[in-house]
Amino acid sequence: MRSLAKWGIGMAVAAAAAAVTAAFLVERHPVGNTSVPEPAKSVDLQRYLGVWFEIARYDQRFERSCTAGVTATYSLRADGSINVVNRCRRSDGSIKEALGRAKIVDRTTNAKLKVSFFGPFYGDYWILDHADDYSWSIVGEPSGRYLWMLSRRSNPGQAAIQELVRRAQGLGYDTRPLIYTEQR
């Protein structure tokens, strides 16, 4: 009887895990780039750390309640991984915050990371291109369903934004579905 109870608990845990996985897979984002390139250059993590302002992105479920002020802050942890703090302002003025952890996957370039905001579940975070002075960055992942354009300045100006769009197009991304972030 005891082994039957253990089997039942095991099946319940497996079913719950399958349900959580299915929930993440239900919403399929359109592919904005069918052949995501490898990151263009190495990343100096010390220079990449700090606050980044989201300039534009592809639509994602986890940012839909964000109406303005989207930032990502990265800081180094003692174990070599990276703290990730994503913040945004909702329409009611409240702040939404997500705390995560990133680990470097490719130590030769530091451009490929895995990021988790939910326990053992990690997603790809590829720094596809960045300015030599680290004033901007273009981030994606291998499926082509996610894209972020980031800047060190909250309002980098129209010329800088158009340059980011041009660079994303050069990486093969369809920039028509971009959502431009208001940084009030």
Model-found features: residue ranges?
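A beta-rich soluble binding module of mature secreted/lumenal proteins
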Residues: R2-R184
